[in-house]
Design a protein with these regions (language model features):
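Gly/Ser-rich catalytic serine loop of serine hydrolases
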Residues: 3-15, 96, 150-162
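Subtilisin-like peptidase catalytic core
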Residues: 3-69, 187-192
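Predominant activation on well-ordered alpha-helical scaffold segments within soluble catalytic domains
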Residues: 18, 48, 163-167, 182
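Structural detector of well-ordered beta-strand residues that form the stable sheet scaffold
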Residues: 31, 90-92
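Mature extracellular/periplasmic domains of secretome proteins
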Residues: 42-63, 74-89, 99-112, 122-134
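A cross-domain feature marking catalytic cores of carbohydrate-active enzymes
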Residues: 66, 93-95
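Extracellular S/T/G-rich loop segment that most often corresponds to the catalytic His/Ser-adjacent loop
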Residues: 100-171, 175, 179
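An often Trp-containing, charged/polar helix-loop segment at the C-terminal end
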Residues: 175-196
C-alpha cells in the first residue's frame, strides 16, 4: 500500500514528533512515513506497510509514536520489530496512553517509552506492565501544521525525545547494537532505580 504523500501530515502528529527529534538531534537526517490520516485515524495495514518500508530502508532509529490494540497485527509487528533489531535498527515505540494491551511497545526488541512528569498522579503513565524508559511527554511545546506551535501531552511526545537521544548516541557510537544502546540508556537514565 503506497499513497501519494503530497498532502504531507494530515493531523499534526508526525510534525509534532519530528519537531521534538529535531530539537534534540538537530543534525540528524529525518524521513517521514505517514500512516495516520486526518483526525488521527489509521489502519493496521498502513501501519504494517509503513513500518515494513522503514525497516527495509535500514534506518538507525525508527520512532513509532503509536500503538495498536488489535491482536491481529501483533505477530507481524513482532516479526518486523525483531527484523529491525537484528539489522541494528533501534525501534522506539510509545506505550498506549491507557492501561490496555497494545503493540509493538511490549516486544523485547523494541525500546518502549512512556511520558514522565514529577506529579505522582501522572495520568499517562502505563504501570502494567511498566515501560522501559520515561521521557518528557507532559505539556510539551511542539511544532504543528502550517508552521504553528502548540502544547500537547502523551506518550507519543515522550517517544521522540528518546529517539533524539538515541540518534545523538549513535552519531558518536555507530557501532552500538540495539542491545548495547538500551544498556547504555539504562545505565544513564535518571529515572532508573539504583542510578548513582
Amino acid at each position: 500500500m503506497v499513497e501519494d504523500d503530497s498532502e504531507g501530515d494530515l493531523c499534526g502528529h508526525g510534525t509534532a514528533c519530528a519537531s521534538i527529534i529535531r530539537s534534540i538531534a538537530p543534525e540528524c537526517r529525518l524521513s517521514s512515513v505517514r500512516v495516520l490520516g486526518a483526525g488521527f485515524t489509521g489502519s493496521g495495514p498502513a501501519l504494517l506497510e509503513g513500518l515494513r518500508w522503514a525497516v527495509a530502508k535500514g534506518y538507525d532509529v525508527i520512532n513509532l509514536s503509536l500503538s495498536t490494540t488489535k491482536r491481529d497485527f501483533a505477530v507481524v509487528l513482532h516479526e518486523l520489530a525483531d527484523s529491525a533489531y537484528f539489522q541494528r535498527t533501534m525501534l522506539i515505540a510509545s506505550a498506549h496512553n491507557m492501561p490496555v494491551e497494545s503493540y509493538p511497545w511490549r516486544f523485547a526488541s523494541v525500546l518502549s517509552v512512556g511520558s514522565h512528569q514529577q506529579d505522582a498522579l501522572d495520568y499517562f503513565y502505563n504501570p502494567t506492565p511498566p515501560v522501559e524508559f520515561f521521557a518528557r511527554g507532559v505539556d510539551v511545546e511542539v511544532g504543528w501544521l502550517d508552521g504553528g506551535r502548540i502544547r500537547s501531552t502523551g506518550n507519543s511526545l515522550a517517544t521522540p525525545h528518546m529517539a533524539g537521544i538515541c540518534a545523538l548516541v549513535l552519531a558518536k557510537h555507530p557501532e552500538l547494537t540495539p542491545f548495547q544502546l538500551k544498556s547504555l540508556l539504562y545505565l544513564t537514565a535518571s529515572n532508573v532505580r539504583g542510578r548513582r
